[in-house]
Amino acid sequence: MPGKLRSASKSESEGTEESMETLQKPSEKKTRKEKPKSKTDEATEGVEEAASSKVKAVKKKGPSEDDVGPPKSKKAKKQEEEPQDDPASKSKTSKKKKEPLEKKAPSAKTKEMKAEEPSEEEADAPKPKKTKKGKEANGDVGEKSPGLKNGLSHPKPDSSSTQAPGEESETEKEIPVEQKEGAFSNFPISEETVKLLKARGVNFLFPIQAKTFHHVYSGKDLIAQARTGTGKTFSFAIPLIEKLQGGLQERKRGRAPQVLVLAPTRELANQVSKDFSDITKKLSVACFYGGTPYGGQIERMRSGIDILVGTPGRIKDHLQNGKLDLTKLKHVVLDEVDQMLDMGFADQVEEILCVAYKKDSEDNPQTLLFSATCPHWVFNVAKKYMKSTYEQVDLIGKKTQKAAITVEHLAIKCHWTERAAVIGDVIRVYSGHQGRTIIFCETKKDAQELSQNTCIKQDAQSLHGDIPQKQREITLKGFRNGNFGVLVATNVAARGLDIPEVDLVVQSCPPKDVESYIHRSGRTGRAGRTGVCICFYQHKEEYQLAQVEQKAGIKFKRIGVPSATEIIKASSKDAIRLLDSVPPTAIGHFKQSAEKLIEEKGAVEALAAALAHISGATSVDQRSLINSQAGFVTMILRCSVEMPNISYAWKELKEQLGESIDAKVKGMVFLKGKLGVCFDVRTEAVTEIKEKWHDSRRWQLTVATEQPELEGPPEGYRGGRGQRDGSRGSFRGQRGGSRNFRGQGQRGGSRNFRGQRPGGGNKSNRSPNKGQKRSFSKAFGQ
């Protein structure tokens, strides 16, 4: 086809020149056809009426051009064939029409067509056809402002009108599919609600909201699963509010709630309640949870409630006291359903819901279950409350990654004794003084201690179950408002909390279950923003980290601790930002001192010292990139060929640096592909090693600036060095065995591997029935 079209257009262009003289003679018809052209020329000056006459002229021209045959039958054929030409609205159709025409060819029609086009603007054959079809496709919509939209003021009307449909399609392409599907006009949402949503910064429904709206609005039971930070709260809040406001009757005092939303934590309940209140002014929204006085809540029930949000404990208390009536419920929402129906909450939830639910009754309230994680057991438990015809919306499905895709997942290997100091450095580099960070700890004690640790230079406060409810609310409000930059919390803050602009999430150790990791990491990278989640782990916790990777469908990028250079660079940027916040009135008081400093130290030295002090980076410890230990520097020894064993590197080090290097090197491990090794040396030994070492064609020694990819786990500290003929260090096996393998020695070989010690068992053996028992807190440094 393309070949035919090209050859056809070639022959047509040749035929055009030959037929020019013949086409100039006929007649009154030709004269009549050229009259609209003069009108078209006038239309190029911006007159809209001329534009519409041009559209008509083109339409008239189309059929007359397409009619092939003697002049006498032309009118009749024009009337018969006119409807067939009109529907043509695509360029493909125009190309298809040319083939048969050219087979019939050198008729008057083809010549006439070709003669007219060059006279207008020497364009290719398809151009006028595209113009006509583009205008026909626009229809009545284009009539509103054809002169302006289609650019008729341009001297080439055909080309400009040809661009109009293209311009429209480009505009359509610019609008993401999500925005098209989530446009408010697609849903029965009142103008009042739309205004309130826009005031909250919501200009269209997010995917989970768009896909669940009609299910919720039509009264169907629903299980919905979507990643954290995708707007699940509004997924049920918007349709329920529209439904209740649509059937709003007289608001009687003391009326019972029609909607009950249960949340696992007080903080989440408070937030859900606020989300409801922000998008309705007609309905009464109340939030009941523990740690607050009963009196105010009882008064709210006397006034009447339309939507009740709360935690299971306090709702159950009001039921038992006979103060709360749930018999009029029409809608029940379980937010974060996996935790809600967990062992600790299942009994309370069942006791609450049995008041409003009857066994196998179609009159039971609509039940909505929402969460980012839905284990299989959730579906089994949910069937007790849901109708058999329930709907399911899953925006995660079989996708391997369950965690938020807007979050970068990093992991740092660090002993618990160094953890607080390294976390302080991490916050400096990844968040800074102006950013917001949430640190998650496993215990209340850890959260309290870490928030008060001097290694964290930013203002930090803790949030956990032992803090009074009123103080918890003040703390969360302060963090939201940016009054302080670091929040150290237990799982209290892991679920559902929508805190804007959290730059960094730090997990002090891998959580016990993958769901916790997903929810914790989801506190950053929300509502389209990107974020970073850094998980700290010890050698003992590598298995737990691997489990998180496997079940959450993510891959941690193993990184080293921030280097001294990175810390200083980040700290200086922070200090410069802080200078911008100093008011001009305050600067005047320090000018005299500044001038004196400049005279004594010089401008650059004085300012550099001031920046160092402001940033708090007056002293920065070098740390190992392998295990984060302070006072060590990681070095890389690269080899141009694959190394058969690690002794190959030891031999080269000793040849150049002497036997004494044996005592200075720690934790040697292969690089990826065995094309070198990396190891730690004391900070004070680095200069001496650099002076003695000379690179060769095969060997190059450098100081590592970032953690390299490793072949496997590093050798045990203090067990990674020794002579090539036997194992040395604290994990001493029999001297006759190889350092790298598993020789059975007097104490059972290296405890890094598979040897059994007489009284204990292998340290790395994870079987609970073998070896000496160790306390959990000692093992994990808690």
Swiss-Prot record:
User: Which processes are annotated in GO (biological process)?
Assistant: defense response to virus; innate immune response; positive regulation of canonical NF-kappaB signal transduction; positive regulation of myeloid dendritic cell cytokine production; positive regulation of transcription by RNA polymerase III; R-loop processing; response to exogenous dsRNA; response to virus
Mind telling me which PROSITE patterns this protein's record contains?
A: HELICASE_ATP_BIND_1, HELICASE_CTER, Q_MOTIF
Please name the GO terms that the record assigns under molecular function: 7SK snRNA binding; ATP binding; ATP hydrolysis activity; double-stranded RNA binding; identical protein binding; miRNA binding; mRNA binding; RNA helicase activity
Keyword annotations: Acetylation, Antiviral defense, ATP-binding, Cytoplasm, Helicase, Hydrolase, Immunity, Innate immunity, Isopeptide bond, Mitochondrion, Nucleotide-binding, Nucleus, Phosphoprotein, Repeat, RNA-binding, rRNA processing, Transcription, Ubl conjugation
Record-listed cross-link Glycyl lysine isopeptide (Lys-Gly) (interchain with G-Cter in SUMO2), residues:
114
Short motif (DEAD box): ranges: 335-338
Q: Does the keyword Ubl conjugation apply?
A: yes
Region (3 X 5 AA repeats) spans which residues? 720-747
| Residues holding ATP | 226-233
Compositional bias segments (type: Basic and acidic residues): 26-42, 99-117, 134-143, 172-181
Residues modified as N6-acetyllysine are: 39, 135, 596, 778
Q: Which family does it belong to?
A: Belongs to the DEAD box helicase family. DDX21/DDX50 subfamily.
Protein name per the record: Nucleolar RNA helicase 2
